Amino acid sequence: LVINLSVLLYTGRLWFNEPKKRDYPIRGPVVTESMGEIRWKSFAKQNIQTAYIRATKGTTIEDGAFRDNWNGSKDTDISVGAYHVLELDTDGTEQAEHFINAVGDDLSGRLIPAVEVRLRGLYRLLPPDYYEAADNLADFCDRIEKQYGVRPVIYCTERTYKNIVASDSRFNKDKIWYESLFSKPDEDMDWTFWTYTNRVKFSFYESGEYLHMTVFNGSEDDFKKLII
């Protein structure tokens, strides 16, 4: 029984979380270069309504497939946004400039940008200076707001939400994209997006790998307000 359960979890046929579509009808995957070539017109017709595409990381790295995915997604009916992976110990304004250079000055018709805040590498064992990380995140958000007139959604895990986002009043009014693969976000958390699993597969992309899947918390009218 334990082995069968493990197989179901690994193959994505059973998840710890399974938010019902009637409760969260707006949903979609996180898109990165590891998916390989994506046939966007077909990919977007698989009962998804949105997607966030990784654009940049730090001050120098651009996702290798970002431009193809950004352009390819224009010809679909789903709402798409771009996100940046924050380097916690690197100047936030410089990171925002890198993101802006990649995605362009005008995001009309796109979802508001997002910024991923996650502990990576040695930081999983030896936590970073959380105050420095919060300063860099705040500087990133401020520069994005100055450029596009909107604050980015903050994509965080339990650890980064607790230690960086929720503990700093500068982020009190920012929209939260919360990743929790084993349980639903706490009832007292005001979240906008929730990544609930990393074991979803679709068709029409080259790698066939498992993807992170996200739902939106709100009505269709609420969702439309996130489009620039």
Give each language-model segment a name.
Residues L1-T11:
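Hydrophobic membrane-insertion alpha-helices, especially the h-region
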Residues R13, K21-K41, I53-D139, E145-Q147:
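Substrate-binding cleft of extracellular glycoside hydrolase catalytic domains
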Residues D23-G36, F171-I228:
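Functionally critical loop-and-helix segments that line ligand-binding/catalytic clefts
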Residues S42-I48:
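A short, Lys/Arg-enriched amphipathic alpha-helix followed by its capping loop at the start of a domain
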Residues Q49, S79, R151:
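Residue-level detector of anion-binding/catalytic polar loops
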Residues A51-I53, G81, K175-E179:
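Short hydrophobic/aromatic-enriched beta-strand-loop microsegments
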Residues L111-E187:
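Catalytic domains of cell-wall/extracellular-matrix polysaccharide-remodeling enzymes
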